[in-house]
Each structure stands twice: as C-alpha cells, then as structure tokens.
C-alpha cells in the first residue's frame, strides 16, 4: 500500500525519462526534423567549412550519422538511439547517438516540452502523495537540467528543491538517514542505487 500510506522509513525517488516522461518519442521527432533540415540544406552547411562554425560541426556529425544509417533518407528510430546494448546497437549506432547528444543535450525547450510516458500520469497519480517523494533523474548538459526542472514544476507541481539531477544515483541509496526506494526503467541506475544501499 503506497498511496498515501508509504512507510516513512523509505525515501522514495522517481526517475523521469522512460518513467514519467516520453524521452524517446520527443527526441526522435526532434532528431528526424533536424536531420532532414540538414539533409535538405547540405550545400549551405558545406559552405561553412573552415569557419569554425558550430553549424558546420553539426553538419559533420549529421553526415557521419547519415553514413551509419545508410543514407539521408533513412528515418532515425528507437533502435538507433537505444540506451542499452539491445541487439548490439550501441556499437553500430555510435555516430547517430553522438548526433542525438549534440542536438538535445542543451535544448531547454525540448526538455521542458517532452510529453508524458505512456502510463506516466497514472503512475504519478498513484505515487504523488507519498511523503517526501522526490525526483531523481540523470541530466545531459545544463539546458537539460533547466528543462527538466521546468517540466517538473509545470506537470507535477513539485518545487525544484524536490528535483535531484545527478549522473550517478548511488549517493541516493541512503538519503537523509532513510533507505531509498527508486522507480527507474534503466538497470544501470537501479544497480547504482542498490550499490548505495537503496532498493
């Protein structure tokens, strides 16, 4: 019985991406739009060569991703940006993932406006009244941190003080003298959390 009656001995944390927030759909939509925009304007991007322009660097990343995909006309899908090594995709899709990070890591607007994960609202409705509930999410760059905080304030109504953004979840396994309980979709972070004493 969690709703409204979670034992106070646990510090409960919920992840965002893949749990409450639909990272995958929003990122794929954004990536494919930008990828096609670059594909349609290659000559303009090529003209920036030697200028030190960040747009030219972006073009080079997109060009490498296009080679990896097998062409500019291939749609980037969830397997291209998979966060785990399902079907050995990490090794095959390195340039595509590099492009993803370049396009989204610092985009405040993107992070602030991602949609809900399927079942995310229902999960939130179930857990939101747990005493002391906090968000624990791994960020990318500074823009992702700000965007995540905006999303949490708007969608969840939580103050930013309840938003923990960290590359490692291990330190949160025991938090404020309580054993932590983490809701997360990624084994990497669940294992880190357990190493820190959490469940």
Per-range role (PLM):
Residues 15, 136-138, 183:
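Short hydrophobic segments within beta-strands
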Residues 4-103, 195:
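Active-site neighborhood of HAD-like aspartate-dependent phosphohydrolases
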Residues 163-194:
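Conserved Lys-Pro-Asp/Glu-containing loop-to-beta segment of HAD-superfamily phosphomonoesterases
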Residues 11, 132-134, 181:
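A structural signal for isolated positions on well-ordered beta-strands in alpha/beta enzyme cores
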Residues 21-24, 28-30, 133, 142-146, ...:
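Short catalytic/ligand-binding loop motif for oxyanion handling, primarily in non-cytosolic enzymes
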Residues 128, 194-197:
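Anion (oxyanion) recognition and catalysis
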Residues 134-145, 149, 154-173:
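A short, structured active-site edge motif that brings together acidic residues
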Residues 71, 88-135, 142-146:
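Short, acidic loop-to-helix structural element flanking the phosphoryl-transfer center
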